[in-house]
Amino acid sequence: MHILKKPDFSDPKLRAKLAKGMGHNYYGEPAWPNDLLYIFPVVILGTFACLVGLAVLDPAMLGDKADPFATPLEILPEWYLYPVFQILRVVPNKLLGIALQTLVPLGLMLIPFIESVNKYQNPFRRPIAMAFFLFGTVITIYLGIGACLPIDKSLTLGLF
């Protein structure tokens, strides 16, 4: 039992369509040789030239030697954990800090149910979701910047 039906080349209608060139994609610029032979190598060589240029002009410097007896005053996590670190650092009760972090995914899961009557996929036509995500982005950036500052200036970002 065959899954695919093989074309019947003895059919005159099919032969007429194939003679006219129907069934083949002839519009636009062909991928061979234009893209594969000329454009791709230019992009690859350009990327390689940028990497070599950056390596020559701005080489990665080695930092200070590791000293296990000299620890910094405050150890910071990786940059993508700054907002979470700031929440745990500022909230007085650590259990409350963890509860605040669990509210983020729960709030994200709630958005489709809040705005279920909106049938549009365009984000600019979904004001509740856009407001929610913009507010979350601003708060995340605010917490990330605050995590880089000392604890006494972290909430006001040193502005007040």
From Swiss-Prot:
One Pfam family from the record: Cytochrom_B_C
Disulfide bonds: none
CDD domains in the record: cytochrome_b_C
Record membrane topology: Multi-pass membrane protein
Gene Ontology molecular function, alphabetical: electron transporter, transferring electrons within cytochrome b6/f complex of photosystem II activity; electron transporter, transferring electrons within the cyclic electron transport pathway of photosynthesis activity; ubiquinol-cytochrome-c reductase activity
GO CC, one annotated term: plasma membrane-derived thylakoid membrane
Signal peptide: none
Location of this chain's protein in the cell: Cellular thylakoid membrane
Single GO biological process annotation from the record: photosynthetic electron transport chain
Keyword terms, alphabetized: Electron transport, Membrane, Photosynthesis, Thylakoid, Transmembrane, Transmembrane helix, Transport
Record text on subunit structure and interactions: The 4 large subunits of the cytochrome b6-f complex are cytochrome b6, subunit IV (17 kDa polypeptide, PetD), cytochrome f and the Rieske protein, while the 4 small subunits are PetG, PetL, PetM and PetN. The complex functions as a dimer.
Task performed by this protein: Component of the cytochrome b6-f complex, which mediates electron transfer between photosystem II (PSII) and photosystem I (PSI), cyclic electron flow around PSI, and state transitions.
Name under which the protein is recorded: Cytochrome b6-f complex subunit 4
Protein source organism: Prochlorococcus marinus (strain MIT 9313)
UniProt lineage: Bacteria, Bacillati, Cyanobacteriota, Cyanophyceae, Synechococcales
Recorded name of the encoding gene: petD
